[in-house]
Amino acid sequence: MKLLIDFFPIILFFAAFKVWGIYVATAVAIAATVVQIGYIRLKHGKVEPLQWLSLGVIVLFGGATLLAHSETFIKWKPTVLYWLMGGTLLVGQLMFRKNFIQSLMGAQIDLPAPVWRNLNWGWTGFFATMGVLNLWVAYHFDTDTWVNFKLFGGIGLMFAFVIAQALYLSRHVKDEGDAAPKDLQP
């Protein structure tokens, strides 16, 4: 169910684009994201910072698309979001010595510091690459191809990267029986 809620705006954007075109799809994406945030807030009481960021970026770039009647802005939206996420990971690591990937996942999984660093750099690179790839598709192909890439290519690459990360992590995660309980370790 969470996955459906996460992909709700992009699925509606895709469907609206196929029926009515980019401008109606953009308005639908803005409305769907507002509904998504409202649902999350009602259901869970808390909206994650990344979700607020996503709402802000879609309202800003989607609104600019509708006001200027130019699809350029909505095509930049994924890149801006990817680069903001990657930039946050980069700045956190370099300037504040804070690994945000570890902060998000550290309670669920115990990993050595170098593995956390590699994960952080991996996600930073992934987001940077996805931002560039989005722009390349946006400026080298027609809008229909870009929308298809946004849904199928972007999500597909994200899933592939998550699977690659899971395989990488599986080499470093200890089975619970392999180590003494944490309260018994020196």
From Swiss-Prot:
<keyword id="KW-0472">Membrane</keyword>
<dbReference type="InterPro" id="IPR006008">
    <property type="entry name" value="YciB"/>
</dbReference>
<keyword id="KW-1133">Transmembrane helix</keyword>
<comment type="similarity">
    <text>Belongs to the YciB family.</text>
</comment>
<feature type="transmembrane region" description="Helical">
    <location>
        <begin position="121"/>
        <end position="141"/>
    </location>
</feature>
<keyword id="KW-1003">Cell membrane</keyword>
<dbReference type="GO" id="GO:0005886">
    <property type="term" value="C:plasma membrane"/>
</dbReference>
<keyword id="KW-0997">Cell inner membrane</keyword>
<feature type="transmembrane region" description="Helical">
    <location>
        <begin position="149"/>
        <end position="169"/>
    </location>
</feature>
<feature type="transmembrane region" description="Helical">
    <location>
        <begin position="76"/>
        <end position="96"/>
    </location>
</feature>
<dbReference type="Pfam" id="PF04279">
    <property type="entry name" value="IspA"/>
</dbReference>
<protein>
    <recommendedName>
        <fullName>Inner membrane-spanning protein YciB</fullName>
    </recommendedName>
</protein>
<feature type="transmembrane region" description="Helical">
    <location>
        <begin position="47"/>
        <end position="67"/>
    </location>
</feature>
<keyword id="KW-0812">Transmembrane</keyword>
<feature type="transmembrane region" description="Helical">
    <location>
        <begin position="10"/>
        <end position="30"/>
    </location>
</feature>
<comment type="function">
    <text>Plays a role in cell envelope biogenesis, maintenance of cell envelope integrity and membrane homeostasis.</text>
</comment>
